[in-house]
């Protein structure tokens, strides 16, 4: 079992590493490529576009051909794209490399969740996804620090060589450690069950909406945090870094505590707790009389996301024994596109950073609470929780 967990964790971590590792080198990259920092900030969106594009086909291929045939090319593409970015001499080539990086990371991301669905039952999967969420929270803190240390001695290209090295590690794990987990092709008698695993299932769609709104909350916070903390609240850059590190610490602590909470409380209870924390955060930020109270509201955001996201993802994947790859792709596409669409629309309409965050917090909590309370699984967990690998 440990081989599947290690490989899944490694496959997922390429995604946040590709986002956060290069940011510290952005000024030097812009200078060397004769581009403005504003022009290169689109590299974030290009990377996410690559991920979304990969998810359009990766899940279906993983269900038809296997998990390894998607993970291995995905890791290889991430390596090649990282090297391509390091050798880029124009901003256009650099952005093309970032898109290819996103394609590779997207393939690996989809496979990771499909593997966990193949190998873990609902309760264990919820615990593991909560742990994975905690580990993922470390990357936005450690990656810029590692990037800064690298750039003290080496040029910005070394950041992408570091990412390529990470990709090589994932490729080696996928080649030599990961075992295939895709369930055997269904017999004719199983075709009705395969056809019953519909993406239009009400319960699945409700969890798609809940996880997409939750990701929109956390990405809105990350995107607006410089404006909120430095421009509106007046913190210095060093203080901003400290606050973000502390919020990551809150996320990790709650994520690592959630598996223990699942041994005491029902998953539904934790999901309701998550949304109540979001609602409390939105109200706190809306009526906050001081910076201290606002910072408390921000910690509620991190705690709310960490306590409920892994549980919701686990529930979303639960009904899909034979189509876990497609389900994982659908979740990823919805989360990436939905959150990006909200942030873009809010900016176009002219909603300020503060109101943007408060709005998504309150909307997410109200909609999600209604879905949790009124959309129940269509059949008992035991009816669809088939695990294909136990060791």
From Swiss-Prot:
Keyword Secreted applies: no
Compartments reported by the entry: Cell inner membrane
Stretches that traverse the bilayer: 4-24, 42-62, 69-89, 93-113, 131-151, 158-178, 203-222, 245-265, 269-289, 293-313, 331-351, 356-376
Protein origin, superkingdom: Bacteria
PROSITE patterns the UniProt entry points to: MFS
GO MF entry, a single one: transmembrane transporter activity
GO biological process, one term: response to antibiotic
GO CC list: plasma membrane
Gene3D superfamilies, sorted: Multidrug resistance protein D
Cytoplasmic side: 1-3, 63-68, 114-130, 179-202, 266-268, 314-330, 377-391
Entry membrane topology: Multi-pass membrane protein
Keywords for this protein: Antibiotic resistance, Cell inner membrane, Cell membrane, Membrane, Transmembrane, Transmembrane helix, Transport
Family annotation (PANTHER family): CHLORAMPHENICOL EFFLUX PUMP RV0191, PURINE EFFLUX PUMP PBUE
Similarity-based family: Belongs to the major facilitator superfamily. DHA1 family. MdtL (TC 2.A.1.2.22) subfamily.
Role summary: Confers resistance to chloramphenicol.
Name of the protein: Multidrug resistance protein MdtL
Native source species: Escherichia coli O6:K15:H31 (strain 536 / UPEC)
Gene: mdtL
